[in-house]
């Protein structure tokens, strides 16, 4: 898979350095995966959730941080729409819904 917005990970790590190892590992696994559907993602990351509208939510560092992505399976693109702490994600999810990010 190709992560189109890898810069977002680097910027998030600058503000949350404790996430560096976990986000680098997540990025490495994603880049070396070839997903065709949600079942493929689930085999790679058991804690991922499909929230609709091609959006998927990954829990990072024991659910302390969340990544919301859009995945285009046919062209193997992963587009990061949101990275934040769990409370930030919950606020945003209440306001607009994860499937609208």
Where would I find each of the regions flagged by the language model?
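Basic, Lys/Arg-enriched alpha-helical interface segments
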Residues: 1-64, 73-79, 86-101
């Amino acid at each position: 898979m190709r992560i189109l917005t890898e810069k977002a990970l680097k910027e998030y790590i600058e503000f949350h350095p404790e996430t560096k190892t976990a986000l680098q590992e997540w990025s490495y696994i994603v880049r070396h995966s070839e997903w065709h559907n949600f079942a493929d993602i689930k085999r790679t990351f058991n804690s991922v959730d499909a929230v609709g509208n091609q959006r998927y939510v990954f829990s990072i560092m024991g659910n302390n941080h969340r990544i919301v992505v859009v995945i285009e399976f046919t062209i193997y693109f992963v587009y990061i729409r949101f990275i934040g702490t769990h409370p930030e994600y919950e606020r945003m999810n209440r306001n607009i819904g994860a499937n609208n990010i």
